[in-house]
């Protein structure tokens, strides 16, 4: 059921990444980054399409060489989703991909070079109507900032960001977003909190190099959740040492948990105990996998007994409450005459969910690729 968020978002300027708005009152977008060799055009395009299929709003692609820039030209032509070029060290690569229709340029203040090079990138971005992300990272701060602070601190990250914000301001360029990422969640949170008080540009959130699928998801949920709950953030990436598709899933789960942006099914399930009347864990695991193609927001409660089951079902779009031999089924908080055989809960509940989606809108089902 609909539970609108009470979070008040920070007011930020809106920019466009391709046809996707970022900032202002636009939905908070979810993005990922390819981990294929960019020169392998087929593999990179295939991964971009997989990311698009699970809901990515935009995708970043690393462009480390001029050969990769030439490959990016083909990749862009074969992609429907906005693409961001990740540029480090060689500013001339940014100029090249701008010619090839890139939707956004990510530059790293720690290695992109002097102000003359930044001016060249900005002039090119302006000519091609391309926004820029100033992407500060705690692991690659400028040498003088590292020397000043000794180690990455919130103020160090923000100083790096503001130095480059000042350059863009002096160049009268305002089509940019900013990130101040760190691998330490608390450091990242403090950095974004500090930066949010000083600029009104859209903020790209992320805990960089967060870790593997489990630990990285937890670290990202804690850090990004803290910021999002304070209204900070306009777009996000969950950085995982895992399949990039998982980054999109976790990103939407974070937004869904805060009732900021819902996509797909929100399962409410008990941790189980000896009172369960059917196998809750197997049911949830099976349905999460089977129903990945559903994009329609929906709360589904799966509770193994009558202690909390009826109460959770009252607050869900669909719900099942464990009972002896057969379990009770609820829709829109109302108990239905249907009762589920406890040995066939998975198939029966999947059928009910798909029927509800079909009655609402077939566009809420995506094709798997």
From Swiss-Prot:
Domain of life: Bacteria
UniProt cofactor note: Binds 1 [4Fe-4S] cluster.
Gene3D superfamilies: Dihydropteroate synthase-like, Sulfite Reductase Hemoprotein, domain 1
Pathway: Isoprenoid biosynthesis; isopentenyl diphosphate biosynthesis via DXP pathway; isopentenyl diphosphate from 1-deoxy-D-xylulose 5-phosphate: step 5/6
Its EC number(s): 1.17.7.3
Annotated keywords: 4Fe-4S, Iron, Iron-sulfur, Isoprene biosynthesis, Metal-binding, Oxidoreductase
Keyword Transmembrane helix: no
Catalytic reactions on record: (2E)-4-hydroxy-3-methylbut-2-enyl diphosphate + oxidized [flavodoxin] + H2O + 2 H(+) = 2-C-methyl-D-erythritol 2,4-cyclic diphosphate + reduced [flavodoxin]
Family named by the database record: Belongs to the IspG family.
Role description: Converts 2C-methyl-D-erythritol 2,4-cyclodiphosphate (ME-2,4cPP) into 1-hydroxy-2-methyl-2-(E)-butenyl 4-diphosphate.
Protein name: 4-hydroxy-3-methylbut-2-en-1-yl diphosphate synthase (flavodoxin)
Source species of the chain: Psychromonas ingrahamii (strain DSM 17664 / CCUG 51855 / 37)
């Amino acid at each position: 059921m609909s539970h609108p968020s009470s979070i008040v978002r920070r007011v930020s300027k809106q920019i466009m990444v391709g046809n996707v708005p970022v900032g202002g009152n636009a939905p908070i977008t979810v993005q990922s980054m390819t981990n294929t060799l960019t020169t392998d055009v087929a593999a990179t395009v295939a991964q971009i399409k997989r990311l698009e299929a699970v809901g990515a709003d935009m995708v970043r692609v690393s462009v480390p060489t001029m050969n990769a820039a030439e490959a990016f030209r083909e990749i862009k032509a074969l992609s429907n989703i906005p693409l961001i070029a990740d540029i480090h060290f060689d500013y001339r690569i940014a100029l090249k991909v701008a010619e090839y229709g890139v939707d956004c340029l990510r530059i790293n203040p720690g290695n992109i070079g002097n102000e003359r090079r930044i001016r060249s990138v900005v002039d090119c971005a302006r000519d091609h109507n391309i926004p820029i992300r100033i992407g500060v990272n705690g692991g690659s701060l400028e040498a003088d900032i590292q020397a000043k602070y000794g180690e990455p601190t919130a103020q160090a990250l923000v100083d790096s960001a503001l130095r480059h914000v000042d350059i863009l301001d002096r160049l009268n360029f305002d089509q940019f977003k900013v990130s101040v990422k760190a691998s330490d969640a608390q450091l990242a949170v403090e950095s974004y909190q500090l930066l949010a008080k000083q600029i009104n540009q859209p903020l790209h959130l992320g805990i960089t190099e967060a870790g593997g699928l489990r630990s990285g998801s937890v670290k990202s949920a804690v850090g990004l959740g803290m910021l999002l709950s304070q209204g900070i953030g306009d777009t996000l990436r969950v950085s995982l040492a895992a399949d990039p598709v998982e980054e999109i899933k976790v990103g939407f789960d974070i937004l869904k948990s805060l009732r900021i942006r819902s996509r797909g099914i929100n399962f409410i399930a008990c941790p189980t105990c000896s009172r369960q009347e059917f196998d809750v864990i197997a049911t949830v695991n099976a349905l999460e996998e089977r129903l990945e193609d559903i994009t329609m927001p929906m709360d589904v409660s799966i509770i193994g007994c009558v202690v909390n089951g009826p109460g959770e079902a009252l607050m869900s779009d669909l719900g099942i409450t464990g009972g002896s031999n057969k379990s009770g089924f609820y829709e829109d908080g109302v108990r239905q005459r249907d009762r589920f055989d406890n040995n066939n809960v998975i198939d029966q509940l999947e059928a009910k969910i798909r029927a509800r989606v079909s009655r609402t809108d077939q566009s809420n089902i995506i094709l798997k690729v």
